Amino acid sequence: MMKFKKCLLPVAMLASFTLAGCQSNADDHAADVYQTDQLNTKQETKTVNIISILPAKVAVDNSQNKRNAQAFGALIGAVAGGVIGHNVGSGSNSGTTAGAVGGGAVGAAAGSMVNDKTLVEGVSLTYKEGTKVYTSTQVGKECQFTTGLAVVITTTYNETRIQPNTKCPEKS
């Protein structure tokens, strides 16, 4: 029984840390992040006047992280289950196999608890363009924006990429 406890604790800790890390940070959705096919291309640019900055939450796709967590959970669960089954089953192949199968199933089930969507920090920017007022919600931090002039870059129809017009304080 002591071997069982010694094996289970590190495996459980590793699995929980790994599954907790399966959350998208959505940095690739920020206004100042571009794909390689958008580089060195002409993009329409305008200046606008930001008049309001409000916090927002943006739901982003997290399904790839969920699939990764399920696969990793199944792998870790199978290994841990095999070791536990081997120890509990007095070294028998059937105990090892049963433990690996059961552990793999439990690990995959644990990985499926990762959400398909995750909420990330965003901003809702209200801005004036000419005489009209618009709102654009995008991934970013409030500290990246300030009221006043900002640049909007359009890479596709009806897209607004309001560029950060200030920097967040550096963490020390």
Curated annotation (Swiss-Prot):
Gene Ontology CC: one annotated term: cell outer membrane
Topology of this chain in the membrane: Lipid-anchor
Residues linked to a lipid group, N-palmitoyl cysteine type: C22
Lipid linkage positions (S-diacylglycerol cysteine): C22
Keyword Lipoprotein annotated: yes
Subcellular location: Cell membrane
Membrane spanning stretches: none
Main location: membrane
UniProt keywords, alphabetically: Cell membrane, Lipoprotein, Membrane, Palmitate, Signal
Region forming the signal peptide: 1-21
Protein name as it appears in the record: Uncharacterized lipoprotein YfgH
Organism: Escherichia coli (strain K12)
Gene: yfgH
